[in-house]
């Protein structure tokens, strides 16, 4: 067991019965020329987030945590995105951007596209799990819940983009399914103004989970920390 200093209070977890979740670290969300950038969102400050996720993944893997990578998107025909009868059709900024700029059709969040790919710096390793997801929450229409329960995993540590959309949505759904969710705030990035990040973190630490940071997380997983607890 290890103790992670967090807000609003410390939380105890067993790394080998926990998972690090990397949410949607795709070119779409973290790279100039990707969907978020083309839709008018600022992605200029995502590089430190990528580096922090690399650090967190390395520490988590060394501690025996399961690493789960999400990729958000749909088939090339966008059948999985839903048609006019789906609220996703009307609210997805990727779909709206493509309707405004038809030349982008088939390029944004389409499986197999550059936009859909994980950023070059983040490469899943053997033993990691990569899951596609068609909506903001990683629990919707995916085997995530089954994967976690079959391994006895109850604690989830979240990183990725966007804090206020897919990260928060997945953590909230996990809360409703009795999972303990922690966000590493400096390994996440919002879609929108800075206040969106602050609001999401406030919601999480006040109502749905815990908030920590990468350095604290890595320190908690270090052998010396385990020795102190033992």
UniProtKB/Swiss-Prot annotation:
Reaction it catalyzes: (Z)-3-ureidoacrylate + H2O + H(+) = (Z)-3-aminoacrylate + NH4(+) + CO2; (Z)-3-ureidoacrylate + H2O = (Z)-3-aminoacrylate + carbamate + H(+); (Z)-2-methylureidoacrylate + H2O + H(+) = (Z)-2-methylaminoacrylate + NH4(+) + CO2
Induction or repression: Up-regulated by the nitrogen regulatory protein C (NtrC also called GlnG) and repressed by RutR.
Top-level EC class: hydrolase
Keyword field contains Disulfide bond: no
GO molecular function annotation: hydrolase activity, acting on carbon-nitrogen (but not peptide) bonds, in linear amides
This enzyme's EC code(s): 3.5.1.110
GO BP terms in the entry: nitrogen utilization; uracil catabolic process
Active-site residues per Swiss-Prot or TrEMBL entry: 24 (proton acceptor), 133, 166 (nucleophile)
Annotated InterPro entries: Isochorismatase-like_dom, Isochorismatase-like_hydrls, Isochorismatase-like_sf, RutB
Coiled-coil residue windows: none
Keywords noted in UniProt: Hydrolase
Keyword set includes Hydrolase: yes
Function in brief: Hydrolyzes ureidoacrylate to form aminoacrylate and carbamate. The carbamate hydrolyzes spontaneously, thereby releasing one of the nitrogen atoms of the pyrimidine ring as ammonia and one of its carbon atoms as CO2.
Classification via PANTHER family: ISOCHORISMATASE-LIKE DOMAIN-CONTAINING PROTEIN, PEROXYUREIDOACRYLATE/UREIDOACRYLATE AMIDOHYDROLASE-RELATED
Family the UniProt entry places it in: Belongs to the isochorismatase family. RutB subfamily.
Protein name according to UniProt: Ureidoacrylate amidohydrolase RutB
């Amino acid at each position: 067991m290890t103790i992670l200093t967090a807000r609003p209070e410390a939380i105890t977890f067993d790394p080998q019965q926990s998972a690090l979740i990397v949410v949607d670290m795709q070119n779409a969300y973290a790279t100039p020329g990707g969907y978020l950038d083309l839709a008018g969102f600022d992605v200029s400050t995502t590089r430190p987030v990528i580096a922090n996720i690399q650090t967190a993944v390395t520490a988590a893997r060394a501690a025996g945590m399961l690493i789960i990578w999400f990729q958000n998107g749909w088939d090339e025909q966008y059948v999985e995105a839903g048609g006019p009868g789906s609220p996703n059709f009307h609210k997805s900024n990727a779909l709206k951007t493509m309707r405004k700029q038809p030349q982008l059709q088939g390029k944004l969040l389409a499986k197999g596209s550059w936009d859909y790919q994980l950023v070059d710096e983040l490469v899943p390793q053997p033993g990691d799990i990569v899951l596609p997801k068609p909506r903001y929450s990683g629990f919707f229409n995916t085997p995530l819940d089954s994967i976690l329960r079959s391994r006895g995993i109850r604690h989830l540590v979240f990183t990725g983009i966007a804090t206020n959309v897919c990260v928060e949505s997945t953590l909230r759904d996990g809360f409703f399914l009795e999972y303990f969710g922690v966000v590493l705030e400096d390994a996440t990035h919002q879609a929108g103004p800075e206040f969106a990040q602050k609001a999401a973190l406030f919601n999480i630490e006040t109502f749905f989970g815990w908030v920590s940071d990468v350095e604290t997380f890595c320190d908690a997983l270090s052998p010396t920390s385990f020795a102190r607890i033992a």
